[in-house]
Amino acid sequence: MMMSFFAAISILAFVPSICAAGDDEVKTEKKMAGDDFNIVRDEVIDGIRYITAAPSSLVCSVRIDIHLKGDVVDSVVYTRGCNGNAKGIGALIRGMKVDEAISRLKGIDCAGRGTSCPDQLARVLEAAMKREPAVK
């Protein structure tokens, strides 16, 4: 009878570690594909906000340069990626309010990757709007 009691205690002691491991896995899975972008520059010079970001490794572009005048997109330039599409995105959102650009671009998927170059732009803009840029 004592062996059964100790065996039960051992099993119960092991269960929380299994559950804890499962919780970590769930947290990891909730991280969205494409969240590995990095804002490398975010500063205001003479009233223009300059944002440079390294997008997710899941997309073809390797850099996004954004200029904002207040809450309006002044220009967007992608480095690498689909040249015509990248130029098209920049031309289409020039003059658009940042919130509108985010709303239109966020969630666009490319080839089942869970993100895209337009989605990365939306994510970068969204993250940038939540922080204060350096002022020079």
Provide a role label for each language-model segment.
Residues 4-14:
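Bacterial N-terminal signal peptides
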Residues 12, 29-33, 130:
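Short amphipathic alpha-helical "recognition" segments used for binding
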Residues 18-31:
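Cleaved targeting-peptide boundary
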Residues 28-56, 66-67:
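N-terminal secretory signal peptides
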Residues 48-50, 54-135:
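Active-site- and interface-proximal helix/loop "cap" or "latch" segments in soluble metabolic
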